[in-house]
Amino acid sequence: MKMAAVGSAKSTGPGQRSKSRPGALSAPLSLEEARCPVCSEILLEPVTMPCGHSVCLHCFQRTVKLISLCCPLCRLRVSSWARKQSREKSLVNAELWELVRLSHPERCKRRMEQRDGEIPDGEIFRAPVPVHKVGEMRQEYEKQKMKSGRSEETDERKKKMHIKEECVLLKHCQYPFCGVSDSENEEPVGRRTRHVSAFVRKTRCSPAFNKSCLHSSAAQRSRSCTDSEDGRGKSRGHTNQAVPEKANIAHSYNAGILLSSENSRSFSAPLLSLDKRHHWRGIHTSSATLVLQTKPERSISPESNDSISEELNHFKPIVCSPCTPPKRLPDGRLLEPMIVKSTPRNLTRALHKSTSYEASPTILQKWKQIEVDRQCIKVTSKGTVTSPIAEDLNLKLSPVEERDCQPCSCSVAKDRLLDLQCICGSNAHKSKSRKDKPIIYNKRRLIFDPYNKGEEKTQVAALIKTFGDSSTPKACKELCEPSEMGPPMLDSNAGHCNQGTVDPDHNIKINEPTTMSCVLNRPTSRRGKKRSQKTKHMEETLQTKISRTNRYDSLDDLIVQRMSQEKEDRELALKLQRQFDRECKKVDRHKTSRNKYELRSWGSKDGIVGYNTRRSGRVSKQNEHFNYTC
């Protein structure tokens, strides 16, 4: 195409020159001027278009007349000119054609005889053939492979370095004060606190923090150079023990709210160091000790976490995102959120609330077992209990039960049983109405009384009694007599196996023992685990409960086996029933069955039998049959 463009640029000269001087022959044309820009050969019967470009007649017909009617070089449209010249038969530029024949007669003759292949060898360009040496291609391949391998290794090394830098940066962001040494204290503060959160910066800028830093900077700097890690742990422990005793509110209601609010803010609050968070929680959760589990550090700087923790140890509200407001019920009352704590020692408060609603016997039994297990864990745990157990073990009665139950004037002679109440009749009218309608009042109460006789030990007893009709003080005294109480028992609805008692007025048996209630007697949280006791005197306290649990193990296994067998039988019966229903729904299409396909009626609606050549014999027979039956 380049050669065609060059040829065309030079071929415009003769055409334009012939137009300018029509009668005179100019000087001979050079080979480049007489070359066709399309086929790169000598011009044969050239056609000069209005734009001045000249091509061979054969090339003009192939590229212009039959295709686009445009100049192949400048894209000028020559359709009207071509039609006009074709009608006049004057497409060939005669003057230019004569000039080309005079300038290059041999080439024109050879072109007209179609002997274009006899071009001299000097004009043909031959590209040099590259000959490779032995192993040159392999060397180039290995060199390229090594280059790509080096680039991959470099990329992997860069990725590893980037990941390592990100890990170091993340660790520094999480624990900004854990690795600061004395040599780093001389660095600018901005470089060390670059990744500290805005909350810590705000705390540092507070006036109280500045005062504490001024007072404690010299002492902490000297201590960081001289004290050992153990000494620092002890001093930190003494500092933490200096917190006011008002902070010791782990078992109160406000402490639970503080814990729940802190847990809900754990994702929105700024990320402080690990030992600070443990110290803040240790004040609330551990009522026995305030010793911290400190993390070993290389040194403590004046701007370290101790100075910040001195500000945070006081009970001030944490400035962070507000908590979610409590939900409101449709009647307008606020729904108190459920508080979940980490240690079983603090989970006893939920059962101390008065319950005035009706609960199922299974739920009451589970509540009792959970309360007993938690009290055992609380007594036998390693931590010391700040509050007496008697205060924690006394369960309050509901307001409904306090109205119904009136304390009698009977005296308990031998045992020191606290909060023992009985139900006495208020008047004779109520007793008569009760005799008319034999109604059994079954009051379920959970009473945990400390039993101290001769030695310091606490007996956890769940006393739930069922009272019938007792209108006289004598009957009330008999019920309140401690010699007749025996071991603590629950009624049949609460889940224990006990002896049945008979109502003398109505001759109705109350508290019938059930086998199903014995299964629920076992503790839920400590079932199948070895109990670790702190002291030996507690073993005698829980011996009765352990023996009762072992007594019903065999019965428990039997009932579980029976229930599993019933479940398997029920599943088998359902499977057989489904199979039977499937067989009943299946339609039998055999010849002898009643569900077989019905035959088509041979008669039409009008009583005229249709004619069919294929079934003419059968149609006639069927018609005769119908006529005979009718």
From Swiss-Prot:
Chain positions of motif MIU motif: 565-582
Record region (Disordered): 1-24, 220-247
Matching SMART domains: RING (SM00184)
Zn-finger segments (RING-type): 36-75
GO function terms (MF aspect): K63-linked polyubiquitin modification-dependent protein binding; nucleosome binding; ubiquitin-protein transferase activity; zinc ion binding
A GO biological process held by the record: protein ubiquitination
EC number: 2.3.2.27
Gene Ontology cellular-component annotations: nucleoplasm; nucleus; site of double-strand break
InterPro entries noted in UniProt: RNF168/RNF169_E3_ubiq-ligase, Znf_RING, Znf_RING/FYVE/PHD
Cell compartments where the protein resides: Nucleus, Nucleoplasm
Pathway(s) it belongs to: Protein modification; protein ubiquitination
Keywords: DNA damage, Metal-binding, Nucleus, Transferase, Ubl conjugation pathway, Zinc, Zinc-finger
Compositional bias per record (Basic and acidic residues), positions renumbered to this chain: 224-233
Reaction(s) catalysed by this chain's protein: S-ubiquitinyl-[E2 ubiquitin-conjugating enzyme]-L-cysteine + [acceptor protein]-L-lysine = [E2 ubiquitin-conjugating enzyme]-L-cysteine + N(6)-ubiquitinyl-[acceptor protein]-L-lysine
Source species, domain of life: Eukaryota
Renumbered ranges of motif LR motif: 599-611
Motif position, UMI motif: 155-163
Gene3D superfamilies, alphabetized: Zinc/RING finger domain, C3HC4 (zinc finger)
Known function: Probable E3 ubiquitin-protein ligase that acts as a negative regulator of double-strand breaks (DSBs) repair following DNA damage.
Homology family: Belongs to the RNF169 family.
Entry's free-text remark on domains: The MIU motif (motif interacting with ubiquitin) mediates the interaction with both 'Lys-48'- and 'Lys-63'-linked ubiquitin chains. The UMI motif also mediates interaction with ubiquitin. The specificity for different types of ubiquitin is mediated by juxtaposition of ubiquitin-binding motifs (MIU and UMI motifs) with LR motifs (LRMs).
Name of protein: E3 ubiquitin-protein ligase RNF169
Lineage of origin: Eukaryota, Metazoa, Chordata, Craniata, Vertebrata
